[in-house]
Every structure is written in C-alpha cells, then in structure tokens.
Amino acid sequence: MDQSGVRNDAFGVDKFGLKNLKAVHWNLGTAALYEYALRNGEAELTREGALCAETGEFTGRSPKDKYTVRDALTDKTMSWSTNQSITPEQFAVLHADFIKHAEGMTLYAQDLCGGADPKFQIKTRVYTELAWHSLFIRTMLRRPETAALADFVPELTIIDLPSFRADPARHGVRSPTVVAIDFTRKIVLIGGTHYAGEMKKSVFTTLNFYLPEQGVLPMHCSANVGAKGDAAVFFGLSGTGKTTLSADPQRTLLGDDEHGWGPDGVFNFEGGCYAKTIRLSREAEPAIYDASLRFGAVLENVVVDSQTRAVDFDDGSKTENTRSAYPLDAIPNASPTGCAGQPKNIVMLAADAFGVLPPIAKLTPSQAMYHFLSGYTAKVAGTERGLGSEPQPEFSACFGAPFLPRDPTVYGEMLRKLIAKHNVDCWLVNTGWTGGKFGIGNRMPIKVTRALLTAALDGSLRNVTFRTDPYFGFAVPTALPGVPSDILDPINTWADKADFKKTAQALVSMFRQNFTKFEKLVDADVLAAAPDARQAAE
C-alpha cells in the first residue's frame, strides 16, 4: 500500500480495519486535491478557479436513509420518534461490508476537528473515495496545525464511499443509500450518495449528541459579532438566509451554519461556509460571490459553460440546491478564532410561504422558547430529496430536527435558561413572502431584512413603537426610518384582505396543532405564548 502526506503512523488505517488498499493520501492540501480530482475526472476547473463537481442523483441530503445504532448508550438518550434505528449487529455487518468494499481503492484521509473551542471539539478522521470530497470536508471542518498531525488520534471516524450500495435485506435499511452512525464506537458510514453535505451534517449530529452533557447547547445557526463584542445568533433551516444575513460587512463573521453556546460564549463548529448559490450575484452578496469563485472553493451542481468554463449561478436546471463550500478566511471579515462572548441577540429566521408573518417581531423569552421548539419555516426545493418545485410549510424543532439525536425539549430548555441567564433579546424574522403567499406574493426584499436586522442588533429597534400582532401575540414595530411602513404590517401588502385573514388563521391552526406534542413537556408560560386560539381557522 502506497501512502503519502503527513500522518500518524502509529494510528493508521489498520486501526479502523481498512486493509488491502491501493493507496492512502493523507492530509493533502488544496492544490494536490485539485490535481487528483481533475485527473480522476471527478470535477472540472472553472474559469475563475473554483472546482465544480456534480453529485448526480442526490443533490441534497437523504434524511430517510439516515440511521443510528440503538444500544445501551442511545436507547434512553435518543429521540426514537424522530430518528431511525439499526441494531449493533446490523451496523457491524454494514461496517464489515464497507471495509471489504474499500479493498483495492485509493482513499483520501483528512485529520480535522469539529469545534473551535478546544475544550469541546471532537477530533475527526474522514476517509473518502473521492478527492473532491476530501477537499470539501477539509474546507468545512477546522484544520489542526501541521505539527499536530504526526500524533493525531481521532475520536470520530467517517468513511464516505459513494460507490458502495447497501443491501436493505442484509443491512436493515430501506435503500442502497445509507448514512449510519454508531455513537458508542464513534463511527459514521456514508454510502450510495455523492452529496458531500452528508459528511458535515454527520459531524454536527455527533456534536448534537455529546455536547449537551458537557453544558454546551449545539445550534443549527449562523453567528456574527459586532465591534463591541456583541454576538448575534441566527437560527434557521436551509434557504432561510443564515449564510446571507450573517455575512454582514459591519460585523465579524463567526460561521454560517453550526455553533455551540457554552460557558464562555458562542463558538463555531466549522472552518468553512456552505452557501446556497442559486441566483447568487455580486451586487447582492459580494463577499459570498467572490468566495464562491476563488481557487479552493468547491461548487456542487452549478452549471458551467462547456467552452468558456464560466459559472452560471442563475441556472437551476440541475437543482435549486446548488452549493459552494469555501474556507471562512475567504470572507474578509471572518473571525480567525471562531469564538465570541455571550450573545446579545437571537434571531429566528422563517421563510414563511404563507406570507402572513411580519418581516420582524420581538419575542418574549417564553415566545422564544415556543418558536424555537416550533421551528417554523418552509422547505425549499432541492435541499432534500422528494420535494417538488414549490416550498412546503414545515415545523422542524429547534430549526434543525433532522440533526437532533435527543428530544427537542433538551435543547429548548437549555436555550431558555441561557436566554434568561444572559438577558438576550430575541427576534423572529420572516425572510419568506410578502404581499401574498407563495405563487402570488414576492420574496421579502433583502434590503428590508438587512435594515431591520441592523436596527435590532444595534439596539435602535428597542426605541420604536410596537403593536401587538392579533394572531401571534408578539410585538411588531409600526415604523422604522428607511423601511416602508406598509411592509411592517403584512395585511397592508395583500390586495385581498379577506384572504389574508383566512391564511393567517390557517397558519395559527398549524402552529397550535404542531405544538400539541410539546404541551405536556413545557411550562404554562410557554403554552401561553402560543398564537391566539380564537384566531385559529374554524
């Protein structure tokens, strides 16, 4: 077996059971991985310098193919109503078959860390069949110093083999695609999909399992920090604006997707960003646009001109879920440490497909807990398999239910205590539709959202007049300099006022119906923060 690159020979592939490999390339850098990816025909070089790969059939995550081993560790700690299980015996067979499948292969190995705070990070080794996958995960996780690689011992090991096909009868799964996690052995097996995002979300899921026991709240969020050290956290599902809104030139970027909130403050889990690029423009998002085109960026399913190799971010013919992975330091104002103090503001982003939520609302602590557990947004086409071309309303607990091994109330109660302890202001922001529901109205102008967020984060929004929303009970500003007053009250943007009322009542009913599963698990003040039952659809 040929090996190249810096590595810990005392803890090599044999420790994972890998054998009879053709070669292993350890901890290769960007240029070398470009060479292998291009030589292997895995990807193409774009005119501006980014590497572009296609993921084929799978252009998003496959949540129905994700499994966790149910054993003594997880039996009482996992939420099995929202997570699928396999037995230790089934995982052992699957693991052995992965090892067998890898024989004769050339693998790429990266030794990385999940978590910017050394006290809470997890050392992660990732074996990939594809060179571009190795570049992707090297970009997305945090890289240790080169000197640390010689004695690197992983706590978590991931092996990603897109050419592997699971056998449902043999492995206890539903299809040839599989993402299987064993928290006891700290092993993740990914097969049957080229979608690189499965790797990063597997690390996130692992941290979501272990960190609560260490007093750290793991969060599906972006985060940034102001000049005065005032950190802000942005919750939201894919497509709600986490990446876009946290990339504020006036604030330092911590990260765009995954963070922990611990005793010392907020810290990024990652070392890169994973931005949606559909209709990305330099005019609207210059920092993300430039970062996505530079040498070292990895593009997924973006259309590239076959002659000029120019990138077309407006073309969604392959998928709406086109993506760019780029290192955090590609953003001019990114934090070099990935760490900040305690947050001053929490923002919950919702892409409201019904167009009835206001562009911004201030939440009480109880309302914040309610909306965090509700996790309302709209699924956007392409970020998961099986969705049509239209967004679908979704309630995803903690704005990240697919990644939560434990019961959502574990994370919700942690958030509530942290908000109270640090006196955090909480906001709900609609980045979805205004002037009507999807298909009738328009997407909320990003300039309006940015203006409202700036006012919230700099404290000036505390000094304006608020009204109480008749449907949801939260406080909504009535006017703000530089923002059209009509847009602040959604009914004013609808041509058909009766249809607005009917649609708002329907959404109230959806909120209340969704929350029934939490009613016996939360305090009375959180229940009282629900939308007004009298406004629910009859």
Swiss-Prot record:
Q: Which UniProt keywords apply?
A: ATP-binding, Cytoplasm, Decarboxylase, Gluconeogenesis, Lyase, Manganese, Metal-binding, Nucleotide-binding
Q: Which amino acid positions bind substrate, per UniProt? A: 61, 195, 201, 323
Residue positions binding ATP: 201, 220, 236-244, 285, 323, 449
Q: Name one GO cellular component term.
A: cytosol
Catalytic class of the enzyme: lyase
- Mention one GO molecular function: phosphoenolpyruvate carboxykinase (ATP) activity
Q: How, per the record, is the cofactor bound?
A: Binds 1 Mn(2+) ion per subunit.
Protein residues bound to Mn(2+):
201, 220, 257
Q: Where in the cell does this protein reside? A: Cytoplasm
CDD domains annotated for this entry? PEPCK_ATP
Pfam families of this UniProt entry? Answer: PEPCK_ATP
The record's principal subcellular location, in a coarse class, is cytoplasm
| The keyword DNA repair appears for this protein | no
Q: What is this enzyme's EC?
A: 4.1.1.49
Per its UniProt record, what InterPro entries does this chain match? PEP_carboxykinase_ATP, PEP_carboxykinase_C, PEP_carboxykinase_N
A GO BP term, please?
gluconeogenesis
Query: What is the reaction catalyzed?
Result: oxaloacetate + ATP = phosphoenolpyruvate + ADP + CO2
Please state the pathway this protein functions in, per its UniProt record. Answer: Carbohydrate biosynthesis; gluconeogenesis
Q: Which cofactor does it need?
A: Mn(2+)
Q: Which family does it belong to?
A: Belongs to the phosphoenolpyruvate carboxykinase (ATP) family.
The entry's function note states: Involved in the gluconeogenesis. Catalyzes the conversion of oxaloacetate (OAA) to phosphoenolpyruvate (PEP) through direct phosphoryl transfer between the nucleoside triphosphate and OAA.
Q: What is this protein called?
A: Phosphoenolpyruvate carboxykinase (ATP)
Name the gene that codes for it: pckA
